[in-house]
Every structure is written in structure tokens, then in C-alpha cells.
A protein has these predicted regions:
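Short alpha-helical segments that sit at the start of domains
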Residues: 2-28
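Short, cationic-aromatic polyanion-contact patches
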Residues: 18-24, 40, 74-97
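A short, conserved structural fragment
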Residues: 64-74
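Short acidic, hydrophobic short linear motifs in intrinsically disordered regions
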Residues: 37-47
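Exposed, interaction-prone assembly regions rather than primary DNA-binding/catalytic cores
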Residues: 4, 17, 46, 53, ...
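Amphipathic alpha-helical dimerization/coiled-coil segments
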Residues: 4, 88-108
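Short amphipathic alpha-helical interaction segments
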Residues: 50-65
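Short amphipathic alpha-helical elements of helix-turn-helix/winged-helix folds
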Residues: 30-35
């Protein structure tokens, strides 16, 4: 997974706040949707451009609570999550695309 530009997008954060009541959940969901299905919080923070993984802890917990992620054991004491099948991942990508389209329109 490579670095994504929408992690710190004000439009993505605003739409995330509207949809989920939390400004990082949408970008997090999109990054997970684009992954191979196994993700690590530290790697996600780096990919999204966040300084620390602490901003992802509650959104990850909520995704586990919703049954969209399953926490799995990792190597060397690292935590990993497995993405579960759901249309929610495609929905997250659609929302990010909409937010970025509105961002592009606003800058033109």
C-alpha cells in the first residue's frame, strides 16, 4: 500500500465528520479498502500521513465493533486487523471520490 493523498484532505475529513461523527474514519476505511486486507495501525498512520496511530485507535475499535474488521495476532507483538467482506468498503471509496471531486471543483 502506498501513501495516499486523501488522508489529510479537509473535504474528506469534513465528509467523514458528517457521515461518521469522526474526522479520520472515512480516510481510514478507504485505506483499508485499498489494502490487501491485512493492516497494521502504525502502517496505516504512515500511509495516511498522520503523526501517530493514536488518532486511529477509536476508529479501528468502532470498525471492529461493527464487524468490519477482526483483530488478529501479528509477528513480534504487532497488532493487525483483517478486513471482513462488506459493501461498506466500496461505499467508503465512493465517499472519498465524492469528497475529492468537490475539493477539485473548489480549487478551480
Amino acid at each position: 500500500m502506498s501513501s495516499v493523498s486523501y488522508g489529510l484532505s479537509p473535504q474528506v475529513q469534513e465528509l467523514s465528520e458528517i457521515m461518521f461523527g469522526q474526522r479520520h474514519r472515512l480516510a481510514l476505511m478507504a485505506a483499508i479498502a485499498q489494502s490487501d486486507g491485512i493492516v497494521n495501525p502504525s502502517e496505516l498512520a504512515d500511509i495516511l500521513g498522520f503523526r501517530a496511530q493514536s488518532s486511529l485507535q477509536m476508529p479501528l475499535k468502532r470498525l471492529v465493533d461493527a464487524g468490519l474488521l477482526t483483530r488478529i495476532s501479528g509477528l513480534e507483538g504487532r497488532v493487525y486487523y483483517r478486513r471482513e467482506d462488506s459493501h461498506a468498503w466500496a461505499f467508503a471509496l465512493e465517499l472519498v471520490a465524492r469528497a475529492l471531486t468537490s475539493e477539485d471543483a473548489a480549487t478551480q
